[in-house]
Amino acid sequence: MAASSSASGAAIGTQTDTTWGRIWDNVPPGFPRYPGSSVAGDTGPEPVSATYAVAGGGDPAQIASWMQAALETATFSTEALSGPLEDGSFVLDSVGDGGCRIQVAIKPMGGLTFVTVRYGAACPEG
Protein backbone atom coordinates (compact mmCIF):
# COMPACT_ATOMS: atom_id res chain seq x y z
CA MET A 1 0.00 0.00 0.00
CA ALA A 2 1.35 3.44 -0.88
CA ALA A 3 2.47 5.86 1.77
CA SER A 4 0.56 9.04 2.38
CA SER A 5 2.00 12.28 1.07
CA SER A 6 1.34 13.95 4.41
CA ALA A 7 4.14 15.27 6.58
CA SER A 8 3.61 12.40 9.04
CA GLY A 9 4.34 9.82 6.36
CA ALA A 10 1.56 7.60 7.73
CA ALA A 11 0.28 4.84 5.49
CA ILE A 12 -3.04 5.30 3.78
CA GLY A 13 -5.78 3.57 5.76
CA THR A 14 -7.38 0.32 4.72
CA GLN A 15 -10.98 -0.32 3.75
CA THR A 16 -13.41 -3.19 4.25
CA ASP A 17 -16.56 -4.29 2.42
CA THR A 18 -19.62 -4.61 4.71
CA THR A 19 -23.33 -5.23 4.21
CA TRP A 20 -23.76 -1.44 4.65
CA GLY A 21 -21.15 -0.69 1.98
CA ARG A 22 -17.40 -0.15 1.77
CA ILE A 23 -15.97 1.62 4.83
CA TRP A 24 -12.67 2.92 6.13
CA ASP A 25 -11.28 0.70 8.88
CA ASN A 26 -10.93 3.75 11.13
CA VAL A 27 -12.17 7.31 11.43
CA PRO A 28 -9.94 10.31 10.72
CA PRO A 29 -8.32 12.29 13.52
CA GLY A 30 -10.75 14.86 14.85
CA PHE A 31 -13.87 12.82 14.02
CA PRO A 32 -16.56 13.83 16.55
CA ARG A 33 -16.50 11.66 19.67
CA TYR A 34 -19.08 11.96 22.44
CA PRO A 35 -17.56 13.54 25.59
CA GLY A 36 -16.58 10.96 28.19
CA SER A 37 -16.58 8.06 25.73
CA SER A 38 -13.66 5.68 25.40
CA VAL A 39 -12.48 3.48 22.56
CA ALA A 40 -14.17 0.09 22.84
CA GLY A 41 -13.19 -3.29 21.48
CA ASP A 42 -15.12 -5.21 18.87
CA THR A 43 -18.79 -5.44 19.85
CA GLY A 44 -20.19 -7.43 16.98
CA PRO A 45 -19.61 -9.54 13.89
CA GLU A 46 -20.04 -6.67 11.39
CA PRO A 47 -16.92 -4.54 10.74
CA VAL A 48 -17.13 -0.87 11.72
CA SER A 49 -14.77 2.10 11.49
CA ALA A 50 -14.87 2.88 15.21
CA THR A 51 -16.63 1.82 18.41
CA TYR A 52 -16.84 3.94 21.55
CA ALA A 53 -18.36 3.13 24.93
CA VAL A 54 -20.11 5.64 27.16
CA ALA A 55 -19.88 4.48 30.78
CA GLY A 56 -22.88 4.78 33.05
CA GLY A 57 -25.32 4.00 30.25
CA GLY A 58 -25.47 7.45 28.65
CA ASP A 59 -28.86 8.46 27.27
CA PRO A 60 -28.98 7.22 23.64
CA ALA A 61 -31.30 10.06 22.55
CA GLN A 62 -28.95 12.67 24.00
CA ILE A 63 -25.91 11.00 22.42
CA ALA A 64 -27.68 10.81 19.03
CA SER A 65 -28.62 14.49 19.24
CA TRP A 66 -25.04 15.44 20.17
CA MET A 67 -23.57 13.37 17.32
CA GLN A 68 -26.04 14.88 14.85
CA ALA A 69 -25.08 18.42 15.88
CA ALA A 70 -21.35 17.59 15.83
CA LEU A 71 -21.52 16.08 12.34
CA GLU A 72 -23.57 19.01 11.04
CA THR A 73 -20.97 21.40 12.50
CA ALA A 74 -18.37 19.37 10.57
CA THR A 75 -20.40 20.13 7.37
CA PHE A 76 -22.19 16.77 7.06
CA SER A 77 -25.93 16.83 6.42
CA THR A 78 -28.40 14.62 8.27
CA GLU A 79 -30.13 12.20 5.93
CA ALA A 80 -32.11 10.43 8.68
CA LEU A 81 -32.25 9.99 12.44
CA SER A 82 -34.17 6.86 13.41
CA GLY A 83 -35.17 5.86 16.91
CA PRO A 84 -35.74 4.89 19.47
CA LEU A 85 -35.90 1.43 17.95
CA GLU A 86 -37.23 -1.62 19.84
CA ASP A 87 -33.89 -2.17 21.59
CA GLY A 88 -33.61 1.51 22.60
CA SER A 89 -31.06 2.29 19.92
CA PHE A 90 -30.82 5.20 17.49
CA VAL A 91 -29.29 5.29 14.00
CA LEU A 92 -27.99 8.51 12.46
CA ASP A 93 -27.30 8.59 8.71
CA SER A 94 -25.29 11.56 7.44
CA VAL A 95 -23.95 12.56 4.03
CA GLY A 96 -21.14 14.79 2.84
CA ASP A 97 -19.52 15.90 -0.39
CA GLY A 98 -18.57 13.45 -3.11
CA GLY A 99 -20.86 10.62 -2.04
CA CYS A 100 -19.50 10.49 1.51
CA ARG A 101 -21.84 8.54 3.81
CA ILE A 102 -21.56 8.09 7.57
CA GLN A 103 -23.71 5.94 9.81
CA VAL A 104 -23.59 6.26 13.59
CA ALA A 105 -25.49 3.70 15.69
CA ILE A 106 -26.08 4.37 19.38
CA LYS A 107 -27.13 1.30 21.39
CA PRO A 108 -27.55 0.76 25.14
CA MET A 109 -26.16 -2.55 26.39
CA GLY A 110 -26.13 -3.22 30.12
CA GLY A 111 -24.43 -0.37 31.96
CA LEU A 112 -22.81 1.00 28.79
CA THR A 113 -24.00 2.76 25.67
CA PHE A 114 -22.05 1.89 22.53
CA VAL A 115 -21.51 4.29 19.65
CA THR A 116 -20.46 2.56 16.43
CA VAL A 117 -19.38 4.45 13.33
CA ARG A 118 -19.36 3.33 9.72
CA TYR A 119 -17.26 5.88 7.85
CA GLY A 120 -17.89 5.38 4.13
CA ALA A 121 -15.05 4.77 1.70
CA ALA A 122 -16.03 7.86 -0.34
CA CYS A 123 -15.34 10.08 2.68
CA PRO A 124 -12.02 11.88 3.01
CA GLU A 125 -9.44 9.89 4.93
CA GLY A 126 -8.39 12.80 7.02
Model-derived regions, located:
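An acidic-aromatic pocket/loop used at catalytic or ligand-binding sites
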Residues: 1-126
